[in-house]
Amino acid sequence: MSHVTTSQEMTEKSKEYFEKIVELTKKEGITLALISGPYLLEERDQEVYNSIGQLAEKDGLLFWNTNTPARYREMALDFSTDYADHAHLNEAGSAKYTAYLGKWLSKNYSFPDRRGQKGYESWENQLMKSGE
């Protein structure tokens, strides 16, 4: 859908909550990153994403759209095998997207290592369950 260059605003309610989230994160000193997960887009979806990109630019926010042919190739997503339906990745697709997102986050942000810290045991338990 990268050929779609027109924009369509999100619904009034969505825009209201978007603005509230932006305001709250700025007030709290939180860096907000807007990330669209991959799914099979309709033209209207891309128009809304174009509008979100414009709002993000206006507010100085990062908008990372993973719904582009180049990003699909980088993730090696196969629409015939990596989706459970038009809007949801299956387990294989989720693993590809999660790995891709993790690499991107690690490259663009710094996160403290919480391994072994009190209060983060559930993270380690989840990591052990996933076999990492």
Where in the sequence are the language-model features?
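Serine/threonine-rich low-complexity intrinsically disordered regions
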Residues: 6, 42, 78-82
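Acidic-and-aromatic substrate-binding clefts and catalytic sites of carbohydrate-active enzymes
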Residues: 9-14, 40-47
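C-terminal regions of proteins
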Residues: 48-131
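Secreted/periplasmic serine-hydrolase-like ester/acetyl group-modifying domain
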Residues: 1-28, 116-132
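Active-site segments of SGNH/GDSL-like serine hydrolases
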Residues: 19-45
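A short, structure-level motif marking secondary-structure boundaries and short turns
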Residues: 5-7, 36-38, 86-87
